[in-house]
């Protein structure tokens, strides 16, 4: 049975989730997180995506993204996923898949759901009991979005003025 096509609309934010195969760690060292974020930034720009929020957990990734073209998030995720898997497999002398199938996607059309989704993403490390406050977690957009600190992915925030 063929898989259902994704519903992604131009300029409508989408919540993307990519999990490690069998929930295995996808990030082992700080360098892994750093490389992933650098490549996320690079491929987001290339595809024309705006990354509004993100969190890199040990075994999965959440992104809140929008783009002017419906194909752009898929292009970004394909390029990013391939490059990161090659890096990870080479670095840790392994082979095979890193990710658990296709990434999942969910449209976030309503503004109240959009803000709830951003909070959900940025509070993930707190819910996982990794930190007490989201600002303590290095691998999320919380500090950039909530506190104006650090480096936004590409200058677009969901924060209300």
Tell me the role of every PLM-derived stretch.
Residues 1-53, 57-58, 66-161:
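Short Pro-Cys-Gly-centered "Cys-loop" motif that presents a nucleophilic cysteine in a tight turn
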């Amino acid at each position: 049975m063929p898989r259902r096509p994704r519903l992604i609309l131009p300029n409508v934010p989408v919540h993307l989730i990519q999990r490690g195969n069998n929930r295995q760690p996808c990030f082992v060292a700080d360098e892994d997180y750093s490389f992933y974020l650098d490549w996320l930034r690079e491929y987001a720009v290339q595809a024309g995506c705006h990354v509004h929020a993100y969190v890199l957990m040990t075994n999965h990734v959440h992104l809140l993204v929008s783009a002017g073209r419906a194909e752009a998030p898929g292009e970004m995720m394909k390029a990013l996923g391939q490059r990161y898997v090659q890096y990870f497999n080479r670095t840790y002398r392994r082979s095979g898949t890193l990710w658990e199938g296709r990434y999942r996607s969910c449209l976030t059309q309503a503004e109240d759901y959009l803000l709830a989704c951003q909070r959900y993403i940025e509070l993930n490390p707190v819910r996982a009991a990794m930190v007490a406050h989201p600002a303590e977690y290095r691998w999320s957009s919380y500090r950039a979005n909530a506190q104006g600190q650090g480096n936004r992915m590409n200058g677009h925030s969901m924060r209300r003025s």
